[in-house]
């Protein structure tokens, strides 16, 4: 059996995705040109230059998600099923010696996020309890398990972060887009909370841990009341006040 060639595999997959998008772009440009010849105009004057940008990017062998798009361009492109416009995470599995920097550098040209791991180490790690895991990672000079890094990479690629709700018998994380305001975070929990949003009681994760509980956070006056324009921070502890 031939030795694995991860760069060739990445190139092959990337090429297939780019060719699929290239066909969509070329077909769309042809239709826009036909509309211009028949009607003397196109429905959206911003579309032809965007498609030309996409064409140049794909012909250069680069995925569309590497382009910086403004809000209007993002909305316009969402009407098409472009594969390379979607965020991509490449996971590189290696032995304990690690992955070469050249391979990581190349993978970064095709992906939003790159995670390198050793599956054998992760398998051994999964058989240990929490305390043993920490000792095992420390011995290997690894700061955190690959599973944690993969979750963080997925959140990063999708533009998400988390806030928490804390109750007497449950603590739960909720994912929202970065830049989300408090009512949107309320809607992630339940649509009624967003519809009847009044205020968000919030504190930081660090304050909660250092204080030891929400009651202690309130005693230390570190619980804040935030309104509709509050931008949710990663790790916020939030309790929604609402009325419907």
Please give the residue ranges for each predicted region.
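Amphipathic, non-membrane alpha-helical segments in soluble helical-bundle scaffolds
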Residues: 15-18, 22, 48, 144
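Conserved phosphoryl-transfer catalytic core
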Residues: 22-30
């Amino acid at each position: 059996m031939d030795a694995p060639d991860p760069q060739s595999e990445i190139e092959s997959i990337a090429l297939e995705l780019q060719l699929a998008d290239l066909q969509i772009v070329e077909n769309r440009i042809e239709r826009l040109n036909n509309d211009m010849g028949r009607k003397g105009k196109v429905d959206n004057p911003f579309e032809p230059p965007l498609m030309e940008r996409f064409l140049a990017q794909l012909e250069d062998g680069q995925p569309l998600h590497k382009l910086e798009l403004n809000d209007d361009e993002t909305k316009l492109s969402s009407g098409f099923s472009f594969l390379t416009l979607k965020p991509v995470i490449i996971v590189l599995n290696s032995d304990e010696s690690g992955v070469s920097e050249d391979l990581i550098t190349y993978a970064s040209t095709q992906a939003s996020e790159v995670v390198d791991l050793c599956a054998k180490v992760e398998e051994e790690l999964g058989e240990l309890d929490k305390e043993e895991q920490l000792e095992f990672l420390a011995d290997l000079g690894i700061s955190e398990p690959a599973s944690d890094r993969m979750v963080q990479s997925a959140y990063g690629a999708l533009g998400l972060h988390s806030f928490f709700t804390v109750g007497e018998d449950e603590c739960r994380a909720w994912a929202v887009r970065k830049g989300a305001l408090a009512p949107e975070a309320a809607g992630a929990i339940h649509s009624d909370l967003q519809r009847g949003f009044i205020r968000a009681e919030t504190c930081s994760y660090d304050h909660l841990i250092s204080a030891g509980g929400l009651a202690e956070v309130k005693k230390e006056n570190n619980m804040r009341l935030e309104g509709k324009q509050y931008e949710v921070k990663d790790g916020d502890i939030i309790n929604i006040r609402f009325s419907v």
